[in-house]
């Protein structure tokens, strides 16, 4: 069976992930890679429906554990219906968020506990972990200011969280970065998109070079 490559992109709100992923997808295609771009929560029909529950339900308070379980359920659907088949075909999967988001947002920032959330997601993803995770590190104040200025962005539940919550998100990502420096690479996302894109491609090309026979 052919084995593809699995790259995930992580970061707090306003880190610029979507913009950079667009550029990365185009660049990798010019380098001859079959790129399957996807996102979490979402990526397949049922997971997109769960996404709407998680991010776009207004006026309904959601229990933190319910939230964590819904993210894991969406991830399972996405994994088995889109990511695994693409990897089996030898594609390069480029995913906007994956398990690290749950560990950070629900595990650390919500206070459930990273290991508790890891256990939930271990059942969902089995052994499917990214070959490379790019963490776009943006200061929460800068990220939230970008979100407020983005006229195209649609509202989601995370936009109403406090600055303290978003600082805990950043703190959680840095804990993961310290624990898994081989897989997770930090990129300073406080800079221009051109600079962030340059460093992003450097990390990806370094990984691609290391995987060649």
UniProtKB/Swiss-Prot annotation:
ATP binds at residues 11-18. GO terms for cellular component: cytosol. Keywords: ATP-binding, Kinase, Nucleotide biosynthesis, Nucleotide-binding, Transferase. GO terms for biological process: dTDP biosynthetic process; dTTP biosynthetic process; dUDP biosynthetic process. It catalyses: dTMP + ATP = dTDP + ADP. It is an enzyme of class 2 (transferase). InterPro entries: P-loop_NTPase, Thymidylate_kin-like_dom, Thymidylate_kin_CS, Thymidylate_kinase. Signal peptide: none annotated. GO terms for molecular function: ATP binding; dTMP kinase activity. Its EC number is 2.7.4.9. PROSITE patterns: THYMIDYLATE_KINASE. NCBIfam families: DTMP_kinase. Belongs to the thymidylate kinase family. Phosphorylation of dTMP to form dTDP in both de novo and salvage pathways of dTTP synthesis. This is Thymidylate kinase. It comes from Shouchella clausii (strain KSM-K16). The lineage of its organism: Bacteria, Bacillati, Bacillota, Bacilli, Bacillales. The gene is tmk.
